[in-house]
């Protein structure tokens, strides 16, 4: 334990173990408590060595005692432990911790002579006089003295942190409590926070960063005069290298005070603000009012998040005035906008007080359902026959029964019978009309009707009188609506059920389906009482109003749309709806709308389903021989699991997913990410493995449509196909491969698995299948409307026509109905009828098109990824903004750079970006295509080989573009012009289906001169030549034939690859020569230098002969510019020549001047080091027939030469070069077999792991001879396992006896099955091949077998480690011995345990198992993890067994786990 062993020695250690943790307790102190205390001191900046003496312990106690009243349990335990150690050093005998505490405190008070310096909890925060204020630094007698912080202040700070959990209130609380504090006091406050070590670490990092910045901004001045106070460093301000007196002097010295306290406070505030943001991650921009959330709750959340924002008050004021209203829900936003500009918070709260409450929700629901419950339109004549209200008591019009002054009639107002009143009427149905009852029933008289019929008729009889005509008219109008209820058993339709549905016959179906374009309101009969009800899949229960079901009910309070409702719950009630009779539970109460919830809908067999397209799914299979993905689901956070569960349940309800059966073995990982608005989650599935094994698909649509290719039309409409992929069914046989799993937190429940029923997002087949389906769906529409332009790319559809507004809308409606009828949705929020139309990144108008707003990013620091995005935006803008350039921007990110690497801007790139910004500031517009006009393309050459072009019809520009791609380092304008024309031609064919007429800046003669030699450029469309300056010209004159009478130069260059030294020179036919020495060059550069020398030393006309294809290719291309310095010099020299003839000859072929110059420049440069090794390698191969790798390794010749030696050997070309690779096995495993050659028996043994063989000829295939060979083999090599076939010689008693004696495990295979002993079978074959190669070198078969074994063991290299079999076997045996030695050595480590610290965490962890102890580090196994820990952070302790494990301070006796204080 290092220094900690010296804390207590001998007798003191024995005395420690006698002291009890608590009075009369059983547990006593142990050495581990001292170890723990020494570790804890590091947290307070105190040295461990202080524990070794009485005085050191006193210093520790002086530091800790002010913190004890407000400190954590760890701090109190540390204080108590130090008190006990102090008593042991003072030779004071104590029995327990409490006695040691009292004794230590009394001694300290007596030694100082006053109790002033011992902090007391009852001490006031401020002096009684009040003059000094609540400042730790106060003035007394003209001097500044330091008053430690009171426990009350520290306690307030600790409670603030614990209660607010680093909420927004912590920062102002710290500012108030630390006013006037020194760094010493602030450190005391930070040390009081026992928990929240993550936050403390963040604050420490901020302190270190700020201290480093302070040191950088305030360098150390020169030497100071004696006695002068030094300037504070960053560590001084942090209080780690300065005393309290120094801090006070810096704060109050004259002149030039340094407020170290305030500076340190500011650093801490920065750290606290970072902690607040970490503990309160909600951004103020993300605080939005929910659709059902009250405004007051939203305001509370808004201001809580606003307090956490560390920004200027003016910005907070702006946030309050704008964001508070902007992020409110639509209902509150409507109210708030009516309050005018800058309303007060009180006005906003008052105005929105009722918004979102139960009463408003009930009112909104009633208004929304008013239309659904309003009777259908009735004929005008019937509508005129409205009757005045009539009293049920006296039969007169003009008043109701409640207002009637006449004596009350006897009998029931409901059925007309006497003996009971209406409230107790046993009849379920009023008998005087076939119409609604309850609150909606018309108030009709009980007396006779005007037609003389009895109003108290049964429901089966037709109504008469005016009221009967009204209901008859309404029923007729309902039938005229044509609404249908679709049957699930055949798609049949039936008229919507009316109020007399039971009397119309059984027209209902077993499983009704409702289209939800309108609210599904039907008539139900509850105990034969008709009621209009809404089928509500979102409601759990069913509630109706206006009916009586008797007294057999249970009172119940339920939460409804109008708040809490008192209801009566009836069970087992008979309900007839849609011609089906069921019994269910129903409630009656005062509800704004009658609803049937899921309890009844489930009984009826109904569910809410999303219609999937009625299309035959396309059969999809996996690639041949492939199986579906079987990847495990990785762990997810609880938040993501809940989001995925919600998404999957919704998709399952909508019919897009179904639960996977337990027999499905496939799985693909799933995860979730936040959408752009950061409020909703998006489910993603990693289909990479499924995409890899799925069959390939053809990309049907290779690009996106361009607006310049659209014909000009009067009317345009844009619509979107919602949930496009989720509307196309996936083939049923393929669904099993899309299975995925939703994990559960802590494995609390079995994981739920799903498969896709529709096309999944992220699967490679979805785009192709969707596009194919959409083409099939839209093809009939296109044929039926040939005058309509229909552009479809994925889920975006554009319809354009010259029809009238009504006809255009009609055709759009037809398309929507076509898509809706097949199960596709066309969301209204993405339906665009009026310009401008947002389409595919463009902005469309009837007569023009533009790009959507382009905003270039503004950044201080640019990374490679930022530049890539910037160039992408500029390239997108270049299709309509002429003059956009990106050449110098692209140069910024040349080479191998990571995406996050910072980019250094050049002046040219900055100028290019500024020029592009100016271009983008001027808005540009494009025109639409008119087929009758000619299509033209004009090409313009700008500076730096950047080309611009525009495609136009007359003066109307359809689109523009740029070209700056240079495929070669050295190029010329004509070649680039051909590439530009090629690009424009392909682009025009794709967009318009025709090639434009070109206007090019080149003369016909120039083009044809270049074209004659360079006709290989892939494809160039025909054009008319129109010369527009600046013209492209060829800069120098290359002739095709040698120039007679002119000096001829033979050039060559050479370079040494190791030293990078080279020579360049030439020889002429007139005897001249010149050689130049080069440094740090290459062969190509040397060849170019030689060519440049020939040009410089020649006349106006010259013939030059080169042997470099590289130089010939550059010069023949007639470049006009290059990035190479030498090539630019060559271009300048060739421009000055009248004529140049350049030819190429092959090198090293003995051609005249070329051979001479080759010798001239090769002296001392070119070295062929391996030539003398080729002949010995050939001799080696002729003797042993070594393989390529052995020759390369032994003789150091190139692999190409070694391969040539082997290929020229007739014996080695029978089967070609063997495929290397060994099957790894245990070191003691051998295989043995017998083979026959030339009538002799050869026994062969092979070491499986290395391929090493032993073989010899035996006289007979017997057990005795085999046993002798095995004994000989075991005496040479370690063998633990022998595998043979089950031949009689291997299964004999002799072999078994030898195997038993040596300790060999024997196993058998099948004699004629090569797989059972494949290694030795293959080696038999190789041995015979080797024997055939060297058979002529020996007479007897015995000799040649041993020679062949030597060749195979020592002359063939390859396989594992690129070694020979002999080298490999010896290496394996050596490695095995080393491993055994290390294992024996490391077995002693198991007796020790290791406690360790990680990173900056000061807490000790462990114990771990010691695996290895090195000089600088130890290797520790903790659970399943293996860690490497530096020796200085590890403590190795012998494991005595049976002791309590110590992994952190919380396991100390007397710590918080026992709830007791040491």
Curated annotation (Swiss-Prot):
Residue ranges annotated as motif Tryptophan repeat motif: 1007-1023
Ranges of residues in domain Integrase catalytic: 1223-1374
Gene3D superfamilies: 1.10.10.200, 1.10.1200.30, 3.30.70.270, Acid Proteases, HIV Type 1 Reverse Transcriptase, subunit A, domain 1, Human Immunodeficiency Virus Type 1 Capsid Protein, Immunodeficiency lentiviruses, gag gene matrix protein p17, Integrase, C-terminal domain superfamily, retroviral
Motif Nuclear export signal: where in chain: 16-22
Active site: 536 (for protease activity)
Annotated site (Essential for RT p66/p51 heterodimerization): 1010, 1023
Any one of the GO CC terms: virion membrane
Residues engaged in binding Mg(2+) 2: 1052, 1087, 1107, 1158
Region (Disordered): 433-509
Integrase-type zinc finger segments: 1172-1213
Family matches, as InterPro entries: Aspartic_peptidase_AS, DNA/RNA_pol_sf, Gag_p24_C, Integrase-like_N, Integrase_C_dom_sf_retrovir, Integrase_C_retrovir, Integrase_cat-core, Integrase_Zn-bd_dom_N
Biased composition (Polar residues): 448-465
EC numbers for this chain: 3.4.23.47, 2.7.7.49, 2.7.7.7, 3.1.26.13
Positions of short motif Nuclear localization signal: 26-32
Activity regulation text: Protease: The viral protease is inhibited by many synthetic protease inhibitors (PIs), such as amprenavir, atazanavir, indinavir, loprinavir, nelfinavir, ritonavir and saquinavir. Use of protease inhibitors in tritherapy regimens permit more ambitious therapeutic strategies. Reverse transcriptase/ribonuclease H: RT can be inhibited either by nucleoside RT inhibitors (NRTIs) or by non nucleoside RT inhibitors (NNRTIs).
Ranges annotated as DNA-binding: 1392-1439
Keywords attached to this entry: AIDS, Aspartyl protease, Capsid protein, DNA integration, DNA recombination, DNA-binding, DNA-directed DNA polymerase, Endonuclease, Eukaryotic host gene expression shutoff by virus, Eukaryotic host translation shutoff by virus, Host cell membrane, Host cytoplasm, Host endosome, Host gene expression shutoff by virus, Host membrane, Host nucleus, Host-virus interaction, Hydrolase, Lipid-binding, Lipoprotein, Magnesium, Membrane, Metal-binding, Multifunctional enzyme, Myristate, Nuclease, Nucleotidyltransferase, Protease, Repeat, RNA-binding, RNA-directed DNA polymerase, Transferase, Viral genome integration, Viral nucleoprotein, Viral penetration into host nucleus, Viral release from host cell, Virion, Virion maturation, Virus entry into host cell, Zinc, Zinc-finger
PROSITE patterns per the UniProt record, alphabetical: ASP_PROT_RETROV (PS50175), ASP_PROTEASE (PS00141), INTEGRASE (PS50994), INTEGRASE_DBD (PS51027), RNASE_H_1 (PS50879), RT_POL (PS50878), ZF_CCHC (PS50158), ZF_INTEGRASE (PS50876)
Cofactor: how bound: Binds 2 magnesium ions for reverse transcriptase polymerase activity. Binds 2 magnesium ions for ribonuclease H (RNase H) activity. Substrate-binding is a precondition for magnesium binding.
Basic and acidic residues compositional bias, start-end: 472-482, 497-507
Domain Reverse transcriptase: 655-845
Residues that, per the record, bind Mg(2+) 1: 720, 795-796
Site, Cis/trans isomerization of proline peptide bond: residue positions: 222-223
Region (Dimerization/Multimerization of capsid protein p24): 279-365
Protein name stated in the entry: Gag-Pol polyprotein
Protein species of origin: Human immunodeficiency virus type 2 subtype A (isolate D194)
């Amino acid at each position: 334990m290092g220094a900690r062993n010296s804390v207590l020695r001998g007798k003191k250690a024995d005395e420690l173990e006698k002291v009890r943790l608590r009075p009369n307790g059983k547990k006593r102190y142990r050495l581990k408590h001292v170890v723990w205390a020494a570790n804890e001191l590091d947290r307070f900046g105190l040295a461990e060595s202080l524990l070794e003496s009485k005085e050191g312990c006193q210093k520790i106690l002086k530091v800790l005692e002010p913190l004890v009243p407000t400190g954590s349990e760890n701090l109190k335990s540390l204080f108590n432990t130090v008190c006990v150690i102090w008593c042991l050093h003072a030779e004071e005998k104590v029995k327990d911790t409490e006695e040691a505490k009292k004794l230590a405190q009394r001694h300290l008070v007596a030694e100082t002579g006053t109790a002033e310096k011992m902090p007391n909890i009852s001490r006031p925060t401020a002096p009684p006089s009040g003059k000094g204020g609540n400042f730790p630094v106060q003035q007394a007698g003209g001097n500044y003295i330091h008053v430690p912080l009171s426990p009350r202040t520290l306690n307030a700070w600790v409670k603030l942190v614990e209660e607010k959990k680093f909420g927004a209130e912590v920062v102002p609380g710290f500012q108030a409590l630390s006013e006037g504090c020194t760094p010493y006091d602030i450190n005391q406050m930070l040390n009081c926070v026992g928990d929240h070590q993550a936050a403390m670490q963040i604050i420490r990092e901020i302190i270190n960063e700020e201290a480093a910045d302070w040191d950088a901004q305030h360098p150390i001045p020169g030497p100071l005069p004696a006695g002068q106070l030094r300037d504070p460093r960053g560590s001084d301000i942090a209080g780690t290298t300065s005393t309290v007196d120094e801090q006070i002097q810096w704060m109050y010295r004259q002149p030039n005070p340094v407020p170290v306290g305030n500076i340190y406070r500011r650093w801490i505030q920065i750290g606290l603000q970072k902690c607040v943001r970490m503990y309160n991650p909600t951004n103020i921009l993300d605080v939005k009012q929910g659709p059902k959330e009250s405004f007051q709750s939203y305001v509370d959340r808004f201001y809580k998040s606003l307090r956490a924002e560390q920004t200027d008050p003016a910005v907070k004021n702006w946030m309050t005035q704008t964001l508070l209203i902007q992020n409110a829900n639509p209902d509150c936003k409507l109210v708030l906008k009516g309050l005018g500009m800058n309303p007060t918070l009180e006005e906003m709260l008052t105005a929105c007080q009722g918004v979102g409450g139960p009463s408003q929700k009930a009112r909104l629901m009633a208004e929304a359902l008013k239309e659904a419950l309003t009777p259908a339109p009735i004929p005008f004549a019937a509508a005129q026959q409205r009757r005045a209200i009539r009293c049920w008591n006296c039969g007169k019009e003009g008043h109701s029964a409640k207002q009637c002054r006449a004596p009350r009639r006897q009998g029931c107002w409901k059925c007309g019978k006497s003996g009971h009143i209406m409230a107790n009427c046993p009849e379920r149905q009023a008998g005087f009309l076939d119409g609604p009852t309850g609150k909606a029933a018309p108030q009709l008289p009980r007396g006779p009707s005007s037609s003389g019929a009895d109003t108290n008729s049964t429901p089966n009889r037709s109504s008469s009188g005016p009221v009967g005509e009204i209901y008859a008219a309404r029923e007729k109008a309902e039938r005229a609506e044509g609404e249908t209820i679709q049957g699930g058993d055949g798609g049949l339709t039936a008229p919507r059920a009316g109020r007399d549905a039971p009397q119309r016959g059984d027209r209902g179906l077993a499983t009704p389906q409702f289209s939800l374009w309108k609210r599904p309101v039907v008539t139900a009969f509850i105990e034969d009482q008709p009621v209009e009800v809404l089928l509500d899949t979102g409601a759990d229960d069913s509630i109706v109003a206006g009916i009586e079901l008797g007294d057999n009910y249970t009172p119940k309070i339920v939460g409804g749309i109008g708040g809490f409702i008192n209801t009566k719950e009836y069970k087992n009630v008979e309900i007839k709806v849609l011609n089906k009779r069921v019994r269910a539970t129903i409630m009656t109460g005062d509800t704004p709308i009658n609803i049937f919830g899921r309890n009844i809908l489930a009984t009826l067999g109904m569910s809410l389903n999303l219609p999937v397209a009625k299309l035959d799914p396309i059969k999809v299979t996996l690639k041949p021989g492939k199986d579906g993905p079987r990847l495990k689901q990785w762990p997810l956070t609880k938040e993501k699991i809940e989001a995925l569960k919600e998404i999957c349940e919704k998709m399952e309800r909508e019919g897009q997913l179904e639960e996977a059966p337990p027999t499905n073995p496939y799985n693909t990982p799933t995860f979730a990410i936040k959408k752009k608005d950061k409020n909703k989650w998006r489910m993603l599935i990693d289909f990479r493995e499924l995409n890899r094994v799925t069959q390939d698909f053809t990309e049907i649509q290779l690009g996106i449509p361009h607006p310049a290719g659209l014909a000009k039309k009067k009317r345009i409409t844009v619509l979107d196909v919602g949930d496009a992929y989720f509307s196309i069914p996936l083939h049923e046989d393929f669904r099993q491969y899309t299975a995925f799993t939703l994990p559960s937190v802590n494995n609390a429940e079995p994981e739920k698995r799903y498969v896709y029923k529709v096309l999944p997002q992220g699967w490679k087949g979805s785009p192709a299948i969707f596009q194919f389906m959409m083409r099939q769906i839209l093809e009939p529409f296109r044929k039926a409307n040939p005058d309509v332009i229909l552009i479809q790319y994925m889920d975006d559809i554009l319809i354009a026509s010259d029809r009238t507004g009504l006809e255009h809308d009609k055709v759009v409606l037809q398309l929507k109905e076509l898509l809706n009828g097949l199960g596709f949705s066309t969301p209204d929020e993405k339906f665009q009828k009026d310009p401008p139309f947002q389409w595919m990144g463009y902005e469309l108008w009837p007569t023009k098109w533009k790009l959507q707003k382009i905003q270039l990013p503004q950044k201080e620091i640019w990374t490679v990824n930022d530049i890539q995005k910037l160039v992408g935006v500029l390239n997108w803008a270049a299709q309509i903004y002429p003059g956009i350039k990106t050449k110098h921007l692209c140069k910024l990110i040349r080479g191998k750079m990571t995406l996050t690497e910072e980019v250094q801007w050049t002046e040219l790139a900055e100028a290019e970006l500024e020029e592009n910004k100016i271009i983008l500031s001027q808005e540009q517009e494009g025109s639409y295509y008119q087929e009758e006009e000619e299509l033209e393309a004009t090409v313009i050459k700008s500076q730096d080989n950047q080309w611009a072009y525009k495609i136009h019809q007359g003066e109307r520009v359809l689109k523009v573009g740029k070209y700056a791609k240079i495929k070669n380092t050295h190029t010329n304008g004509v070649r680039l012009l051909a590439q530009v024309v090629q690009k424009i031609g392909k682009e025009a064919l794709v967009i318009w289906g025709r090639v434009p007429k070109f206007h090019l800046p080149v003369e016909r003669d120039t083009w044809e001169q270049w074209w004659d030699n360079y006709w290989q450029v892939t494809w160039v469309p025909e054009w008319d030549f129109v010369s527009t300056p600046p013209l492209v010209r060829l800069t120098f004159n290359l002739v095709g034939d040698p120039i007679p009478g002119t000096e001829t130069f033979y050039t060559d260059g050479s370079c040494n690859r190791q030293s990078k030294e080279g020579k360049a020179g030439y020889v002429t036919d007139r005897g001249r020569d010149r050689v130049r020495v080069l440094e740090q060059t290459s062969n190509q550069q040397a060849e170019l230098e030689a060519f440049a020398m020939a040009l410089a030393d020649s006349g106006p006309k010259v013939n030059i002969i080169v042997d470099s294809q590289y130089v010939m290719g550059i010069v023949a291309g007639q470049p006009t510019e290059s990035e190479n310095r030498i090539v630019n010099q060559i271009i300048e020299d060739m421009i000055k020549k009248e004529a140049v003839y350049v030819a190429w000859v092959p090198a090293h072929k003995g051609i005249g001047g070329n051979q001479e110059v080759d010798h001239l420049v090769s002296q001392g440069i070119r070295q062929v080091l391996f030539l003398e090794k080729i002949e010995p390698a050939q001799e080696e191969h002729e003797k042993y027939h070594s393989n390529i790798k052995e020759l390369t390794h032994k003789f150091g010749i190139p692999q190409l030469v070694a391969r040539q030696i082997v290929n020229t050997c007739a014996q080695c070309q029978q089967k070609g070069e063997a495929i290397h690779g060994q099957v790894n096995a245990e070191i003691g495993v051998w295989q043995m077999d017998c083979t026959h050659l030339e009538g002799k028996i050869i026994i062969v043994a092979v070491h499986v792991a290395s391929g090493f063989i032993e073989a010899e000829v035996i006289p007979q295939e017997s057990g005795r001879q085999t046993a002798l060979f095995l004994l000989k083999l075991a005496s040479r090599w370690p063998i633990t396992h022998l595998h043979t076939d089950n031949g009689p010689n291997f299964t004999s008693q002799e072999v078994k006896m030898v195997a038993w004696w040596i300790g060999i495990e024997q196993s058998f295979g099948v004699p004629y099955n090569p797989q059972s002993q494949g290694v030795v079978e293959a080696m038999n074959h190789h041995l015979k091949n080797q024997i055939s190669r060297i058979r002529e070198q020996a007479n007897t078969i015995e000799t040649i077998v041993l020679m062949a074994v030597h060749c195979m063991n020592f002359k063939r290299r390859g396989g594992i480690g690129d070694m020979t079999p002999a080298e490999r076997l010896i290496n394996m045996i050596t490695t095995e011995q080393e491993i055994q030695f290390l294992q024996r050595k490391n077995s002693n480590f198991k007796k020790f345990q290791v406690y360790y610290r990680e990173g900056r965490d000061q807490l000790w962890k462990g114990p771990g198992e010691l695996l290895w102890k090195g000089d600088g580090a130890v290797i520790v196994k903790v659970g399943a993890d293996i860690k490497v820990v530096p020796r200085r952070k590890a403590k190795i302790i012998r494991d005595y067994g049976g002791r309590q494990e110590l992994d952190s301070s919380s396991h100390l006796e007397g710590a918080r786990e026992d709830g007791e204080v040491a």
